Amino acid sequence: MVAQRTFVMIKPDGVKRGLIGEIISRFEKRGLKIVSLKMVKMSRDTAEKLYEEHKGKSFFEELVNYVTSGPVVCMVIEGDDVVQVIRRMIGNTDPKEAPPGTIRGDYALSKSENVIHASDSIEKAQREMSLFFDKSDL
């Protein structure tokens, strides 16, 4: 199997609550490789690009305001079938639907403060990585 790369972002509530190390540890224990990592304060423009598929939805403004409210940790993670592996590890967007043992099941406070974002396809991962990382970072 060929290793793939995906984009993962620890959201402001995860950073503020000191969950960065715990989340990274889960990925590393699963045998995934952190290729690049940075903490940033996301601009509104970047947030709107990151979540462009939600533009026009009722929660879009709240989401953009939330992810720009504090620092986030952006990562490029590599591994076999990494997109699906990480999607399973993070759990459902709604923490009530996320089983215990998943990142959101264990740490998310609400649908909006759900600790983490991860790309849901290779195509989206490539687009999302390019918002935060130059080719030289990878």
Swiss-Prot record:
It comes from the Archaea. Its EC number is 2.7.4.6. Its cofactor is Mg(2+). It catalyses: a 2'-deoxyribonucleoside 5'-diphosphate + ATP = a 2'-deoxyribonucleoside 5'-triphosphate + ADP; a ribonucleoside 5'-diphosphate + ATP = a ribonucleoside 5'-triphosphate + ADP. One of its GO terms (cellular component) is cytoplasm. Keywords: ATP-binding, Cytoplasm, Kinase, Magnesium, Metal-binding, Nucleotide metabolism, Nucleotide-binding, Phosphoprotein, Transferase. The active site is at H117 (pros-phosphohistidine intermediate). It is found in: Cytoplasm. ATP binds at K11, F59, R87, T93, R104, N114. It is an enzyme of class 2 (transferase). CDD domains: NDPk_I (cd04413). One of its GO terms (biological process) is UTP biosynthetic process. GO terms for molecular function: ATP binding; metal ion binding; nucleoside diphosphate kinase activity. Gene3D superfamilies: Nucleoside diphosphate kinase-like domain. Its main location: cytoplasm. Belongs to the NDK family. Major role in the synthesis of nucleoside triphosphates other than ATP. The ATP gamma phosphate is transferred to the NDP beta phosphate via a ping-pong mechanism, using a phosphorylated active-site intermediate. NCBIfam families: PRK00668.1. This is Nucleoside diphosphate kinase. It comes from Saccharolobus solfataricus (strain ATCC 35092 / DSM 1617 / JCM 11322 / P2) (Sulfolobus solfataricus). The lineage of its organism: Archaea, Thermoproteota, Thermoprotei, Sulfolobales, Sulfolobaceae.
